[in-house]
Amino acid sequence: MMLPLQGAQMLQMLEKSLRKSLPASLKVYGTVFHINHGNPFNLKAVVDKWPDFNTVVVCPQEQDMTDDLDHYTNTYQIYSKDPQNCQEFLGSPELINWKQHLQIQSSQPSLNEAIQNLAAIKSFKVKQTQRILYMAAETAKELTPFLLKSKILSPNGGKPKAINQEMFKLSSMDVTHAHLVNKFWHFGGNERSQRFIERCIQTFPTCCLLGPEGTPVCWDLMDQTGEMRMAGTLPEYRLHGLVTYVIYSHAQKLGKLGFPVYSHVDYSNEAMQKMSYTLQHVPIPRSWNQWNCVPL
């Protein structure tokens, strides 16, 4: 059975229910949170049953997924209370179009088995990417206080070093800056990623530092799941703590709007892990997962 959730009441109940399953449900919780705040990406939430759902899938409307090669748009966020038994639901052709290039995102590494099994059945190849998920301390305090029990947060800690404000000006990104983000984004560098970046800039709060030329030298964006993403710094401005300043400022901005604040870092990116530690972001290992699926 497949049940699209209609109306504000159902979606608010879903958000409340997902909140009880954090941090395992974070990627879906963040997406549903923004569906309930105007749904700027025009997404839908589908469950296997209601109200006692086992699995929830959030994805774009069918009419928005017309490009079979655009996995940036053809993206599904998934949370399951029963990852071992969600394979049948995920395999339903009305739910996920396995003939497209697509990506699945989840805070649950345990979904891997179901996705790998489906790859064999539906004949597509799958590449899993796993990263460290970080939650801002303020968000963790509100949503998952148990994650902070063993953490000692200094009351005035978590702030970046001051920057030269004569030289750099805090600002927001403009859609004309998308090419810059696309050039340095690990998952980007193509025409479809450029369109996705443009949409994120037009839709969600962004943050950047403008350099002496009045153009961005460092930036941070947000995606449809509410995650801070695509941070970058021009090579000649690296190692000056600018990205720490931008991410701190962006997190403050999102926090003031009442948004859950979280991000991810590659296991090999020690500089960004150190930065997350400086800003007192709370690490949740193995909790950022993406599966890129390509039909054979």
Curated annotation (Swiss-Prot):
<protein>
    <recommendedName>
        <fullName>Glycine N-acyltransferase</fullName>
        <ecNumber>2.3.1.13</ecNumber>
        <ecNumber>2.3.1.71</ecNumber>
    </recommendedName>
</protein>
<dbReference type="InterPro" id="IPR013652">
    <property type="entry name" value="Glycine_N-acyltransferase_C"/>
</dbReference>
<dbReference type="GO" id="GO:0006805">
    <property type="term" value="P:xenobiotic metabolic process"/>
</dbReference>
<dbReference type="GO" id="GO:0016746">
    <property type="term" value="F:acyltransferase activity"/>
</dbReference>
<dbReference type="GO" id="GO:0005739">
    <property type="term" value="C:mitochondrion"/>
</dbReference>
<feature type="modified residue" description="N6-acetyllysine; alternate">
    <location>
        <position position="16"/>
    </location>
</feature>
<feature type="modified residue" description="N6-succinyllysine; alternate">
    <location>
        <position position="256"/>
    </location>
</feature>
<feature type="modified residue" description="N6-succinyllysine; alternate">
    <location>
        <position position="127"/>
    </location>
</feature>
<dbReference type="GO" id="GO:0047962">
    <property type="term" value="F:glycine N-benzoyltransferase activity"/>
</dbReference>
<feature type="modified residue" description="N6-acetyllysine">
    <location>
        <position position="159"/>
    </location>
</feature>
<feature type="modified residue" description="N6-acetyllysine; alternate">
    <location>
        <position position="183"/>
    </location>
</feature>
<dbReference type="Pfam" id="PF06021">
    <property type="entry name" value="Gly_acyl_tr_N"/>
</dbReference>
<dbReference type="GO" id="GO:1901787">
    <property type="term" value="P:benzoyl-CoA metabolic process"/>
</dbReference>
<keyword id="KW-0808">Transferase</keyword>
<dbReference type="GO" id="GO:0009636">
    <property type="term" value="P:response to toxic substance"/>
</dbReference>
<dbReference type="GO" id="GO:0032787">
    <property type="term" value="P:monocarboxylic acid metabolic process"/>
</dbReference>
<dbReference type="InterPro" id="IPR010313">
    <property type="entry name" value="Glycine_N-acyltransferase"/>
</dbReference>
<dbReference type="GO" id="GO:0006637">
    <property type="term" value="P:acyl-CoA metabolic process"/>
</dbReference>
<keyword id="KW-0012">Acyltransferase</keyword>
<dbReference type="GO" id="GO:0047961">
    <property type="term" value="F:glycine N-acyltransferase activity"/>
</dbReference>
<feature type="modified residue" description="N6-succinyllysine; alternate">
    <location>
        <position position="141"/>
    </location>
</feature>
<feature type="modified residue" description="N6-succinyllysine; alternate">
    <location>
        <position position="183"/>
    </location>
</feature>
<keyword id="KW-0496">Mitochondrion</keyword>
<dbReference type="InterPro" id="IPR016181">
    <property type="entry name" value="Acyl_CoA_acyltransferase"/>
</dbReference>
<comment type="similarity">
    <text>Belongs to the glycine N-acyltransferase family.</text>
</comment>
<dbReference type="InterPro" id="IPR015938">
    <property type="entry name" value="Glycine_N-acyltransferase_N"/>
</dbReference>
<feature type="modified residue" description="N6-acetyllysine; alternate">
    <location>
        <position position="256"/>
    </location>
</feature>
<feature type="modified residue" description="N6-succinyllysine">
    <location>
        <position position="169"/>
    </location>
</feature>
<feature type="modified residue" description="N6-acetyllysine; alternate">
    <location>
        <position position="141"/>
    </location>
</feature>
<dbReference type="Pfam" id="PF08444">
    <property type="entry name" value="Gly_acyl_tr_C"/>
</dbReference>
<dbReference type="GO" id="GO:0006544">
    <property type="term" value="P:glycine metabolic process"/>
</dbReference>
<dbReference type="GO" id="GO:0005759">
    <property type="term" value="C:mitochondrial matrix"/>
</dbReference>
<feature type="modified residue" description="N6-acetyllysine; alternate">
    <location>
        <position position="127"/>
    </location>
</feature>
<keyword id="KW-0216">Detoxification</keyword>
<feature type="modified residue" description="N6-succinyllysine; alternate">
    <location>
        <position position="16"/>
    </location>
</feature>
<comment type="function">
    <text>Mitochondrial acyltransferase which transfers an acyl group to the N-terminus of glycine and glutamine, although much less efficiently. Can conjugate numerous substrates to form a variety of N-acylglycines, with a preference for benzoyl-CoA over phenylacetyl-CoA as acyl donors. Thereby detoxify xenobiotics, such as benzoic acid or salicylic acid, and endogenous organic acids, such as isovaleric acid.</text>
</comment>
<keyword id="KW-0007">Acetylation</keyword>
